[in-house]
């Protein structure tokens, strides 16, 4: 078992319930299990990404690394948002340059016949097995996830996603619905296996205007949020620009990018929805003293908010030094909220 002491119930789940009234806020990091860690790179030298994503023992080991190395308050499952195309009967490869490749490419209505949905329990059984291993070992909450349907469609279709949406909306919406249905089944499998919360990454929603978001993304996200029985966090690189649209979906939490002050954004978010974020990931290139200073600015601005979860405004970048990531996490863990004893580390 990991050695970190854990509150019961964990502060991360308390914050998701908007009830983390005592002590510091919880902290975890998007992409915390990833390329900035030398331990991850050691595994990467031995295995192709396909094997890393689809081997339960490697899923377990990589998911657990940041718990042991940087001491975050929650684990997020090591997986890929393109598991859904696998469950649609497509092939996903990671050639190393230019990002993942989905084959065959789905570029229009005529290509929908290439999609052959499979039961997620069969196609993605390795995810379930990895979750089981983690739940036997870790003492912090485990976050499962999937990609937003629009984002998954973007990867499946390439650069022509909006062309398809406008030129043949009927078939485009059929694909979005198919992705949504498989995503719900996939997340339900994760919940049954033991994850404590879900985050939906609709990363490419920043390609959309507000009107387009309400048409092409929001209805499908709504279906997912309403279908899942554990707390759901929504994230997009455009979340600071889609505050009211995200709030309308009534998730348990919204994770915001760094383009707008979080203490201002929260004024537009009901007190029943937690807020997560939102340090600019590139600040972690700065010296640790600067990282501490910038992190403390956000902590002070959000001090006393029982629904605050500390995170970056996007995933940690692959060339950030581990000590800099640890400086961010340690700053949060050493933060003394109003009414606590100064200098006391609350783990």
Question: Predicted regions: what is each one?
Answer:
Residues 1-96, 222-223, 322-347:
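N-terminal basic, low-complexity leaders that serve as flexible interaction/assembly modules and, when applicable
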Residues 2-23, 44, 119, 123, ...:
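Metal- and O2-centered redox machinery and metal/ROS homeostasis
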Residues 20-51, 81, 86-96, 104-107, ...:
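N-terminal small/glycine-rich loop or linker at the start of catalytic domains
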Residues 35-39, 103-106, 215-217, 235-239:
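A broad, low-specificity signal for short, low-complexity segments enriched in glycine/proline
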Residues 41-53, 108-120, 247:
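Short, basic, glycine/proline-bearing loop/turn elements
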Residues 55, 105-109, 287:
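Intrinsic-disorder/low-complexity, polar/charged segments
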Residues 97-135:
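A gly/proline- and charged-residue-enriched helix-loop-helix capping module
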Residues 123-347:
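Active-site loop segments of alpha/beta catalytic cores
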């Amino acid at each position: 078992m990991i050695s970190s002491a854990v509150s019961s119930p964990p502060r991360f789940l308390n914050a998701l319930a908007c009830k983390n009234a005592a002590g510091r806020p919880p902290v975890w990091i998007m992409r915390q299990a990833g390329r900035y860690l030398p331990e991850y790179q050691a595994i990467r030298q031995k295995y192709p990404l396909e094997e890393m994503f689809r081997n339960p023992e490697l899923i377990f080991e990589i998911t657990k690394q940041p718990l042991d190395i940087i001491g975050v308050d929650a684990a997020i499952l090591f997986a890929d948002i393109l598991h859904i195309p696998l469950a649609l009967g497509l092939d996903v490869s990671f050639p190393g340059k230019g990002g993942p490749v989905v084959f065959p490419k789905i570029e229009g209505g005529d290509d929908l016949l290439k999609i052959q949905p499979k039961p997620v329990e069969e196609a993605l059984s390795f995810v379930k097995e990895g979750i089981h291993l983690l739940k036997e070992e870790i003492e912090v909450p485990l976050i499962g996830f999937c990609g937003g349907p629009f984002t998954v469609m973007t990867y499946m279709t390439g650069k022509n996603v909006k062309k398809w949406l406008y030129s043949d909306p009927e078939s485009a919406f059929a694909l979005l619905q198919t992705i949504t249905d498989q995503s719900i089944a996939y997340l339900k499998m994760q919940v049954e296996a033991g994850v404590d919360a879900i985050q939906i990454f609709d990363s490419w929603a920043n390609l959309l205007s507000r009107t387009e978001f309400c048409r092409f993304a929001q209805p499908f996200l709504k279906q997912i949020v309403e279908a899942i029985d554990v707390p759901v966090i929504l994230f997009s690189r455009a979340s600071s620009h889609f505050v009211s649209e995200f709030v309308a979906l009534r998730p348990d939490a919204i994770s915001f990018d760094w383009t707008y002050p979080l203490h201002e954004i929260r004024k537009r978010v009901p007190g029943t929805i937690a807020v997560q974020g939102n340090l600019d990931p590139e600040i972690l290139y700065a010296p640790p003293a600067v990282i501490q200073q910038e992190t403390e600015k956000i902590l002070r601005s959000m001090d006393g908010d029982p629904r605050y979860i500390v995170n970056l405004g996007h995933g940690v970048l692959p060339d950030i030094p581990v000590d800099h990531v640890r400086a961010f996490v340690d700053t949060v863990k050493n933060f003394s909220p109003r009414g606590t004893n100064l200098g006391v580390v609350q783990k």
